[in-house]
């Protein structure tokens, strides 16, 4: 469990020198997130080798992806509650063991059922790491919430960029089973080492010069003065709008994440060499992961300045345009690389904007648990993006209808953010802040201010 000089102790009773450096907390969370990225973002490289070895269909293989994402997301509310209760160090230590076992077990699986089980174990571990790292960033950085949550989420998006080439090479030389085992050991160890540096903020802790920062921050983000419990959050209409939006927006990126290899093969660009001896597929995955990482702090920073809902609207109009262009030009290797990258640049920000909006509207005390509930929407989306998209392709013999489903979801959610969520969130924040004032609760930031 978390053993620190400040665990459960009011901040006022702790000498400043004994409070952990919050930037070290951020770095440790980033490293842990990078170490779990391969479980999701390198998956597409394993699909065809697994098909060949286990003699199963693409739909059956992609059920593995759904199980991983479902367990990575649907257990996060409970895991987040444990992180809030026990602390991130102990919980991420448990997560590191599960992450390692997930890929090691997958490497030894000789049936599709055992692959489902072991990849699911990895999903549980990844969920602990993801929820714990994001929750810690929310708590340590109320003054830079969008940026620092974005940086943490970016690590999950960009982590595979540095490993995709060696993983692809190892797959060719040693096969997917050996690759799973070796990288499972590496990833588990890195998460374990990172977890040793993590700790919760002391009770009542605020960043340096917090009062001065509050006074200077312009009114750009809907921010509640009330820390809502998960049950209170579930009573808010805004939660259900956020959940539906998260589901629709997660769908598009998860389709490309899971199906990029089969898509490239369908359009005959998977083996075309485009750069330094690397195929269009490997280059695309590398570029995608880099942009998928960079987009998260970028749009987090943008949302700190123009508001979360405005950032969602702009980015997902861009996403819809990028998906449409990819549909038209996917058979050209260079455009395949460039436009799949643009899709990820417009998509990956949901993992910085939605945690930030959750913290803004429902407070930071239960931020890990509350965002964990919102994050389960990714698991719902995975059912449609993994086996669902593979089934639609098998039935139609084309990816066209899958692309159009992505475009429609992006456009609907973008307009929901601007026309529905934005005014509803503003009204809800005003009401909660008035309630807090009436109850004598100190309000650090009024409605439309940044927490």
Describe each PLM feature range.
Residues 43-48, 231-299, 385:
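Extracytoplasmic gate region of multi-pass secondary transporters
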Residues 50-51, 82-83, 162, 166-174, ...:
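Interfacial helix-cap and linker-helix signal at transmembrane-aqueous boundaries
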Residues 74-112, 303-309:
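Conserved MFS/SLC helix-loop-helix module at the cytosolic interface between two early adjacent transmembrane helices
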């Amino acid at each position: 469990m978390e053993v620190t000089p400040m665990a459960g102790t009011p901040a006022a009773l702790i000498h400043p020198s004994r409070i952990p450096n919050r930037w070290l907390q951020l770095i440790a969370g980033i490293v842990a997130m990078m170490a779990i990225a391969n479980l999701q973002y390198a998956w597409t490289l394993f699909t065809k080798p697994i098909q060949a070895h286990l003699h199963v269909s693409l739909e059956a293989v992609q059920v593995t992806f759904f199980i991983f994402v479902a367990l990575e997301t649907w257990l996060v509310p409970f895991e987040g509650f444990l992180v809030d209760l026990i602390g991130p160090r102990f919980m991420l230590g448990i997560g590191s063991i599960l992450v390692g076992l997930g890929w090691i077990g997958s490497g030894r699986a000789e049936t599709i059922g055992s692959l489902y089980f072991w990849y699911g174990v990895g999903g549980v571990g990844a969920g602990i790491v993801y929820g714990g790292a994001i929750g810690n960033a929310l708590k340590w950085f109320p003054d830079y919430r969008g940026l620092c949550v974005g940086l943490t989420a970016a690590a999950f998006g960009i982590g595979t960029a540095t490993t995709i080439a060696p993983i692809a090479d190892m797959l060719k030389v040693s096969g997917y089973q050996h690759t799973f085992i070796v990288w499972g050991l590496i990833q588990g160890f890195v998460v374990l080492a990172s977890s040793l540096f993590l700790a919760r903020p002391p009770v009542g802790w605020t960043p340096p010069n917090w009062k001065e920062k509050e006074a200077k921050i312009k009114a750009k983000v809907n921010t509640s003065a009330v820390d809502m419990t998960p049950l209170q959050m579930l009573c808010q209409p805004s939660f259900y709008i956020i959940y539906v939006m998260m589901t629709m927006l997660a769908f598009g990126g998860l389709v490309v994440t899971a199906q990029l290899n089969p898509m490239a093969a369908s359009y005959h660009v998977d083996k075309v060499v485009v750069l330094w001896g690397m195929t269009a597929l490997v280059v695309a995955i590398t570029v995608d992961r880099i942009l998928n990482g960079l987009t998260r702090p970028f749009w987090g920073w943008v949302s700190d300045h123009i508001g979360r809902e405005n950032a969602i609207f702009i980015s997902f109009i861009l996403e819809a345009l990028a998906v449409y262009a990819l549909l038209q030009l996917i058979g050209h290797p260079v455009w395949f690389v460039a436009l799949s990258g643009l899709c990820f640049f417009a998509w990956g920000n949901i993992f910085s904007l939605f945690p930030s909006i959750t913290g803004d509207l429902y407070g930071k005390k239960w931020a890990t648990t509350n965002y964990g509930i919102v994050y389960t929407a990714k698991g719902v989306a995975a059912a449609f993006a993994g086996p669902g998209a593979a089934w639609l392709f098998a039935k139609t013999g084309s990816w066209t209808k899958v692309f159009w489903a992505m475009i429609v979801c992006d456009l609907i959610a973008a307009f929901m953010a601007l026309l529905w969520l934005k005014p509803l969130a503003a009204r809800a924040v005003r009401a909660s802040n008035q309630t807090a004032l009436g109850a004598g609760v100190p309000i650090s930031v009024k409605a439309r201010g940044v927490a």
